[in-house]
Design a protein with these regions (language model features):
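Alpha-helical segment of the N-proximal tetratricopeptide repeat
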Residues: 24-50, 54, 194-220, 224, ...
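Helix-start (N-cap) detector for alpha-helical repeat units in TPR-like alpha-solenoids
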Residues: 25, 59-60, 93-94, 127-128, ...
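Structural signature of tandem alpha-helical TPR/SEL1-like repeats
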Residues: 37-46, 71-84, 106-118, 145-153, ...
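Structural marker of alpha-solenoid helical repeat scaffolds
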Residues: 54, 87-89, 122-126, 161, ...
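Canonical tetratricopeptide repeat
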Residues: 64, 98, 133, 137, ...
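TPR/TPR-like (Sel1-like) alpha-helical repeat modules
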Residues: 119-122, 136-143, 148-166, 173, ...
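Terminal, low-structured helical/coil segments at or just beyond the last alpha-helical repeat
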Residues: 167-174, 182-201, 342-383
C-alpha cells in the first residue's frame, strides 16, 4: 500500500457485546482489548481469534481482528474476518470499505470496486481516517474504470484538506489526463506529463482555488506535451472552471485537431454552442459525439434540449429518455424531460419526472459533491 494511506489505526467501535456472557469469553475479550491497546498485536490477534470462536456473533471481535490483520498486510485473513460483519446489516458500511481495501491490495480490482460502491450505498460509514483511505483507493479504481470525472470528485476534497501530496498529485494527474492506469503501472515515460497535470489539478481544487499556480503548471504541460492527446482538453476544463469560456473553447478545438473523436471535447463545445443559442452547431457536435459513443448521456441530453428549443417534442422526448436511461441520477435530465412531457400533455409522466428532479436536488443539498456523483455511478452500474 502507498505511504500516505498505508496503515489504519482503527478507533471505530461497533455495537457492544451482549451484557451477559460466559465468564471465559468475558476474560478472553478483556485480554484481547488489553493486548490491542498495548499494541501487542500477535497476542491481540490470537485472543480475538479465540474470542470469535467462543462467540461467533461478537461483532467487535471480528472488527478488531479484521483491522489488526489488515494493518499486518494479511489481507485474505482480514477479508474473512470482515465477512462475518455482514450478518448484522447495521454495521455493513465500514466492513464494505475494508473489504474494498483488502481486495485492492490482493489485486482483485473489480471486486474492490464493487465493495466500494456498496460502501457508498451504505452511507460512507467509518472514521475520518478510514474514509480518507477508502475514498482515495475508490478514486484510483474509478480512474482505472474510465470514470475520470467521478474520480476527481472524490480526490478533490482530499486535496483540499491534505494539500500538496505526491500520491494525490499522481492520482489527480492520471484522472485529469484520462489515463486508465493505477499509479504503479503507467508507462514511466509519462511520469512528467502526469505530474504536471496533477499539480495543476491539485491547485485548482484548493479552497480557495489557486488558479494562478494551476495555470502555471498547465502552461508548462501544454508547452512540453501540447501535441499529445488529452492535454488541450484538460487545459480547457481548467479554463472552464475559471469561467474563461473563450479560452476553454479554443482548447477544446485544439484537442479535436489531435483527437477528432474526443467525445468529452465534442460535448463541451456542443454545450457552449447551445448556451450561445447556436443550435445548428450544437446539434452537429452532439450528433458527432453520439456517433462515436451512443452511451454518452450528456450528448443525448444536449440533443434533447436542442429538439425542445426547436419545438420538436417527440424527438426531444426520445433523446431525453435515452439520457435518463444512461444517467438516471442527473436532475437536469429529469427536469427537461418533465418539461417535454408537460408540453406533450403527458401529465402523470411529467409529474413523476418533476418529483424525481426535486428529490435529486434535495439530495444534492445535503450531500457532498462526491457523494451525489457516486450515487449516480452506483445506479448506472446496476444497468
Amino acid at each position: 500500500m502507498r505511504p500516505l494511506f498505508s496503515v489504519l489505526v482503527i478507533c471505530f467501535s461497533l455495537a457492544a457485546s451482549a451484557a451477559t456472557v460466559p465468564d471465559h469469553f468475558e476474560t478472553i475479550a478483556k485480554q484481547a482489548e488489553t493486548a490491542r491497546t498495548q499494541e501487542r498485536v500477535p497476542d491481540a490477534i490470537r485472543l480475538y481469534r479465540e474470542g470469535t470462536k467462543l462467540r461467533p456473533s461478537w461483532e467487535d471481535g471480528w472488527w478488531y481482528l479484521g483491522s489488526l490483520l489488515y494493518d499486518q498486510d494479511r489481507f485474505p485473513e482480514a477479508t474473512a474476518a470482515f465477512q462475518h460483519l455482514f450478518v448484522n446489516t447495521s454495521h455493513r458500511g465500514p466492513a464494505y470499505a475494508f473489504l474494498g481495501l483488502c481486495n485492492f491490495e490482493t489485486g482483485k480490482y473489480n471486486d474492490a470496486l464493487a465493495q466500494f460502491r456498496a460502501w457508498a450505498g451504505a452511507g460512507w460509514a467509518g472514521t475520518r481516517e478510514l474514509r480518507d483511505v477508502a475514498e482515495y483507493h475508490f478514486a484510483l479504481l474509478l480512474t482505472r474504470d474510465g470514470r475520470f470525472v467521478e474520480s476527481l470528485y472524490l480526490i478533490a476534497p482530499l486535496a483540499q484538506r491534505l494539500g500538496e501530496n505526491p500520491e494525490l498529485v499522481e492520482a489527480m494527474g492520471l484522472a485529469s489526463l484520462r489515463m486508465s492506469y493505477l499509479p504503479e503501472n503507467y508507462p514511466p515515460e509519462q511520469r512528467e506529463r502526469i505530474w504536471l497535470a496533477g499539480k495543476a489539478a491539485l491547485y485548482a481544487a484548493q479552497s480557495p482555488k489557486d488558479f494562478e499556480r494551476a495555470d502555471e503548471y498547465a502552461a508548462r504541460l501544454e508547452s512540453r506535451y501540447g501535441t499529445q492527446p488529452e492535454v488541450h482538453y484538460f487545459r480547457g476544463t481548467l479554463y472552464g472552471f475559471e469561467g474563461n469560456r473563450t479560452e476553454a473553447e479554443r482548447e477544446y478545438r485544439e484537442e479535436l485537431k489531435i483527437s477528432p473523436n474526443h467525445v468529452p471535447a465534442l460535448v463541451a463545445l456542443a454545450g457552449s454552442d447551445l448556451e450561445k443559442d447556436d443550435r445548428a452547431e450544437a446539434s452537429t457536435l452532439a450528433q458527432r459525439a453520439v456517433a462515436v459513443d451512443s452511451n454518452e448521456a450528456e450528448a443525448h441530453h444536449l440533443l434533447g434540449r436542442i429538439f425542445l428549443a426547436n419545438a420538436d417534442l417527440h424527438a426531444a422526448a426520445a433523446e431525453l429518455e435515452k439520457a435518463k436511461q444512461l444517467a438516471p441520477g442527473n436532475p437536469l435530465i429529469r427536469s427537461h424531460l418533465a418539461m417535454v412531457y408537460s408540453k406533450l400533455g403527458r401529465t402523470q409522466e411529467a409529474k413523476a419526472e418533476s418529483d424525481a428532479f426535486l428529490a435529486l436536488k434535495n439530495k444534492e443539498e445535503v450531500m457532498e459533491s462526491p457523494r451525489e456523483k457516486l450515487d449516480e455511478i452506483n445506479r448506472e452500474s446496476a444497468h
